[in-house]
Amino acid sequence: LKDDLNDSITEDDAVEMLAQHIITRPVFEVLFEGHQFTSENPVSRAMQRALDVLDEANLDKESKDLEKFYASVRMRASGITDPQAKQRLVVELYEKFFAKAFKRTTDKLGIVYTPVEIVDFIIHSVNEVLQQEFGQTLGSEGVHIIDPFTGTGTFITRLLQSGLIAPEEMEHKFRHEIHANEIVLLAYYIAAINIEAVYHGIMGGDYVPFEGICLTDTFQMYESDDLVSRYMPDNSERRKRQKASDIRVIVGNPPYSIGQDSENRSEERRVG
């Protein structure tokens, strides 16, 4: 985690990330039944391996108090087949439950989510500049796009839904030329699922993982080599591919936090 995120990750941070995984996995399994995210995503697999080692401590009992919550999610999710409706439910859960359950993380990292209208304006403005100045579009082959602070994936999902990427361009763009980074585990999970669900809704067919997303600190990832890649090899490999890519377009909204009066001022300076 120190390698993939940053050197300031503490033991408490690691414990909280495992707690996030324990709490959220049942939610995603309910919302995206049959979806292969939890078995295919490299970070989810790495977290699950750590929990498998800890199973002897009967960790399941720690989440039994949440059974009513999981049951309510199952009830709300039953019958929802529209990917956008599931997206809305996931983001609502994040805003009303997850962000409050892990308030220290959200306060520390200054998490802010951009209104969809602003996201759409930014995406279309970038496409116009590409056309006017470079004779290309966001769908053009060779135009690598990154959202370095993806949050729950709104910029990427709206890009896919924008109509600016032609149907014949979509598969190549999705598989090879769209990149996203996120440092908060919960948001990373939600972003990956949202992006994959939107792509599947557009293209249909079999499940296709979004291999362009990394659990990483964008500010730190260019400052050191992979030192412990054996622990999260697939995520580290994604980071290496991203660093080797010729990024042409950066879209997004950097996280910020105002008025912090704690040790977390160091986080402010990282974004500042």
Each predicted region: which residue ranges?
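Non-catalytic, mostly N-terminal accessory regions of nucleic-acid modification and defense proteins
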Residues: 1-117, 199-212
